[in-house]
């Protein structure tokens, strides 16, 4: 088995790394908040690294699950980054969601050092990370993907090699923009139902049985209806992903009006201080526009 390093033990990362530990991989872990990494190491028998460079020195494959491209670059290429300790032939797998252009740039720098790179962002919330049933879309060479596959299969249920380096990120961003737009449309539908006196339970059942069915309906209708924004995926992270998707559409010269509108609504929710709660809180802004409370 490859020795695996894991950097980024947040809501998703800790659960993903735990599945690798349970599968028998020898883990070296690092987290910006040291106490999280220390607790994880004690619980799962992992080695605690003080810096990403130490992770690189003790690993054949290094997985990153952090917030944005700046963090990925710092973790992999910074003064105390993975490349400061990693040997030639090491491979890095970034499972964060970042700009495809950042992925390609970081990948080029790694390849100059003889280090492979795969971008493998995920879809699915923390329960799926816990169960190892995430959907993973991977970009990179066929050889690098096949090397990463055994570890990805521990963390995910559906693993798809979508193309060259960076295309995993592109697919993920499009998917999340669709999900966010769907959630916004769902919130609007519930508000219309409330304003017109419709029984919301009946509306949700009918939509779920017909052409209005969606994953967002299943996951977010009741939280929106009850204003329960327990965090499965932070609103600020969804806004980041939608904005990154819109950067891609602008570069390609194509419109994505649904995502553009949803980005504005998410930004308004951020302005209300809702960034740290679940993106189901998008309903708060739309309730305000309609002057109707679910």
Regions found by a protein language model. Give the residues of each.
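NAD(P)+-binding Rossmann beta1-loop-alpha1 motif at the extreme N-terminus of oxidoreductases
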Residues: 1-65, 90, 95
């Amino acid at each position: 088995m490859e020795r695996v390093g894991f950097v980024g033990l947040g809501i998703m990362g800790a659960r993903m790394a735990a599945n690798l530990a349970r599968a028998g991989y020898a883990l070296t872990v690092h987290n910006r908040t040291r106490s999280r990494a220390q607790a994880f190491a004690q619980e799962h028998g992992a080695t605690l690294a003080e810096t990403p460079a130490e992770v690189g020195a003790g690993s054949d494959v290094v997985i990153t699950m952090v917030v944005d491209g700046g963090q990925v670059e710092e973790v992999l290429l910074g003064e105390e980054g993975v490349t400061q300790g990693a040997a030639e032939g090491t491979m890095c797998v970034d499972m964060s969601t970042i700009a495809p252009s950042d992925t390609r740039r970081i990948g080029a720098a790694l390849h100059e050092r003889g280090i492979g790179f795969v971008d493998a962002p995920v879809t699915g919330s923390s329960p799926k990370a816990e169960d190892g049933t995430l959907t993973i879309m991977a970009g990179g060479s066929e050889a690098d993907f096949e090397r990463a596959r055994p570890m990805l299969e521990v963390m995910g249920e559906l693993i798809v090699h979508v193309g060259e380096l960076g295309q995993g990120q592109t697919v993920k961003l499009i998917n999340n923009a669709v999900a966010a737009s769907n959630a916004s449309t769902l919130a609007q539908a519930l508000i219309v139902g409330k304003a017109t006196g419709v029984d919301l339970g009946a509306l949700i059942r009918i939509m779920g049985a017909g052409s209005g069915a969606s994953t967002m309906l299943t996951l977010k209708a009741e939280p929106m209806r009850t204003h329960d924004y327990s965090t499965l995926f932070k609103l600020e992270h969804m806004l980041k992903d939608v904005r990154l998707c819109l950067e891609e559409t602008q570069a390609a010269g194509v419109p994505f009006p649904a995502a553009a509108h949803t980005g504005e609504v998410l930004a308004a929710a951020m302005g209300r201080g809702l960034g740290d709660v679940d993106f189901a809180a998008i309903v708060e802004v739309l309730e305000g526009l309609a002057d109707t409370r679910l």
